[in-house]
Amino acid sequence: MKVIFLKDVKGKGKKGETKNVADGYANNFLIKNGYAVEANNAALSTLSAQKKKEDKLAAEELAEAKALKEKMENLTVELKAKSGEGGRLFGSITSKQIAQTLEKTHGIKIDKRKMDLPEAIRALGHTKVPVKLHHEVTATLDVHVSEE
């Protein structure tokens, strides 16, 4: 019997796949427990419509991320901090502070975990911070730390 998997089933199939399985297995386990539905014309057309919708959403997300990247590449985030001799900061600038300042000054809300800052900024000056907007799109944000 041909079935369309609604959920991942270990060793049998992934969500959205159409496979041929034994009739008893399909009726008594997969369909009964909601892991799959019988692959008839209506179910197949629903599956193809759902895949088109998911592809469209993914394309929109990618386009949105690319537009945000263009906007962010031209921005400079200005932060002020107290510093001592030689431009060393008292404390440090974290990705959380950068995200808050970016939202406050430019109105762009970015999750602090998307900023690839291996360690906090501890010196005055310009720093390039990579920001992962999408699994295919990474923007570089210019952060300028000046003396308070």
Curated annotation (Swiss-Prot):
It comes from the Bacteria. One of its GO terms (molecular function) is structural constituent of ribosome. Keywords: Ribonucleoprotein, Ribosomal protein, RNA-binding, rRNA-binding. GO terms for cellular component: ribonucleoprotein complex; ribosome. GO terms for biological process: translation. Pfam families: Ribosomal_L9_C, Ribosomal_L9_N. InterPro entries: Ribosomal_bL9 (IPR000244), Ribosomal_bL9/RNase_H1_N (IPR009027), Ribosomal_bL9_bac/chp (IPR020594), Ribosomal_bL9_C (IPR020069), Ribosomal_bL9_C_sf (IPR036791), Ribosomal_bL9_N (IPR020070), Ribosomal_bL9_N_sf (IPR036935). Binds to the 23S rRNA. Belongs to the bacterial ribosomal protein bL9 family. This is Large ribosomal subunit protein bL9. It comes from Listeria monocytogenes serotype 4b (strain CLIP80459). The lineage of its organism: Bacteria, Bacillati, Bacillota, Bacilli, Bacillales. The gene is rplI.
